[in-house]
């Protein structure tokens, strides 16, 4: 049998998936609306006890139609595993469309129309009182959660918020200069370690796991493959791979925005040799 995510087969998620905002709310100069919205990953059946709030979908997510499946998602999957959470989670993003260009997301941090739709998702996931902790990935996600909390103070009061550094902070910080990739990675992992005890105290695990902190670098097991049960029916198994298999390509900005190149990882090329 091949487990899969059933998608948006129940309310209010059916209405949320069919009634998403378009370019009138998400301006194409700041968002890749041409690739369509990507809504979530994880459980929508009321069994989630942790909500992960991310930023925006990237390249791998555009292909799989589920969020946080690339390297950032694999790092988050490893964080959840440290809490003993293997299935009782759900994930949504601050923006349902991929951000385009520097500052595209920041310009819309408090956009009321974008927030109104996002709040409907957060209401659907957080008001039923099954989720006990929210993990916000980065500044934009933390701000988005706090904007929602202002509209639902009673619900927010019972939730534990872990506002952690975004999982790709090391790459973005080192690319900006002033810090090495190694130092930025150590900074990220130290930040995650700081939040682990309180998260454990507020989250009932799916299975008991020993308490472990991160080191100063990524170690074996720190990244976890995406469960196939989180992906649409018929998804190829290599979509869960730790290998990077999708990237934007093109000789200029116009073509690069229009093109995603998908390459099946070597380990998944199980067909007979070709000549």
Cite the ranges covered by each PLM segment.
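A polyanion-binding, active-site-adjacent surface
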Residues: 1-275
């Amino acid at each position: 049998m091949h487990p899969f995510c059933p998608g948006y087969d129940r309310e209010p998620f059916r209405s949320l998936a069919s009634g998403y905002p378009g370019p009138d709310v998400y301006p194409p100069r700041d968002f890749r609306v041409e690739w369509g919205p990507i809504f979530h990953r994880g459980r929508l059946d009321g069994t989630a006890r942790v909500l992960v709030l991310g930023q925006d979908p990237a390249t791998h997510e555009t292909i799989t139609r589920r969020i946080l499946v690339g390297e950032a998602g694999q790092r988050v999957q490893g964080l959840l595993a440290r809490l003993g959470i293997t299935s009782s989670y759900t994930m949504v993003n601050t923006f349902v469309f991929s951000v385009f260009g520097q500052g595209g997301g920041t310009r819309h941090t408090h956009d009321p129309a974008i927030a109104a739709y996002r709040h409907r998702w957060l209401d659907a996931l957080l008001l039923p009182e099954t989720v006990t902790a929210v993990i916000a990935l980065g500044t934009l996600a933390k701000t988005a959660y706090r904007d929602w909390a202002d509209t639902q103070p009673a619900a927010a009061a019972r939730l534990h918020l872990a506002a952690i550094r975004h999982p790709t902070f090391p790459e973005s910080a080192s690319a900006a200069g002033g810090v090495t990739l190694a130092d930025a990675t150590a900074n990220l992992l130290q930040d995650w370690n700081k939040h682990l005890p309180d998260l454990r105290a507020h989250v009932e695990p799916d299975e008991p796991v020993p308490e472990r902190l991160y080191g100063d670098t990524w170690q074996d097991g720190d990244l976890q493959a995406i469960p196939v049960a989180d992906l649409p029916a018929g998804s190829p198994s290599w979509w869960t791979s730790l290998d990077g298999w999708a990237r934007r390509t093109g000789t200029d900005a116009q073509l690069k925005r229009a093109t995603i190149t998908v390459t099946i990882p070597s380990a998944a090329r199980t067909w007979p040799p070709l000549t």
